[in-house]
């Protein structure tokens, strides 16, 4: 099963670049199959990691950044991959 972990944080206004640099520097205890980092307006950063694991597996996640860098606690989501529906017809 492929599991995707999503980690999203919002930096204090004008500090999105610092948050992005911080997220890129974070290492995990295990290497995921894939890791991608995104940015968005309002100084937001998203990191998605993909794992070959059960949905409820104990997987390493990025920590909370220093409170002076972010406006709120990190949002975290976990998803499992499902097969695409067959094309109609």
Language model regions located:
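Signature tryptophan residues that serve as conserved aromatic anchors
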Residues: 7, 50-51
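Short amphipathic alpha-helical segments
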Residues: 11-34, 62-65
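Feature marks short, surface-exposed loop/turn motifs that line or immediately flank catalytic pockets
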Residues: 13, 41, 54-55
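Short glycine-/aliphatic-rich beta-strand segments at the starts of folded cytosolic domains
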Residues: 2-11
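Glycine-rich beta-strand-turn "strand-cap" elements at beta-sheet edges
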Residues: 1, 33-46, 62-89
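Soluble, non-membrane globular domain cores that form compact, hydrophobic packing
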Residues: 2, 27, 57-60
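Short amphipathic alpha-helices within nucleic acid-binding modules
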Residues: 17, 52-61
């Amino acid at each position: 099963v492929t599991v995707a972990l999503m980690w999203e944080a919002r930096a204090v206004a004008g500090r999105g670049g610092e948050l992005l640099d911080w997220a890129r520097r974070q290492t995990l205890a295990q290497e995921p199959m894939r890791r991608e980092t995104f940015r968005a307006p309002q100084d937001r950063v998203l990191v998605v990691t993909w794992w070959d694991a059960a949905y409820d597996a104990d997987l390493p996640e990025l920590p909370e950044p220093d409170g002076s860098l972010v406006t709120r606690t990190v949002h975290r989501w976990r998803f499992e991959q499902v097969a695409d529906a067959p094309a109609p017809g």
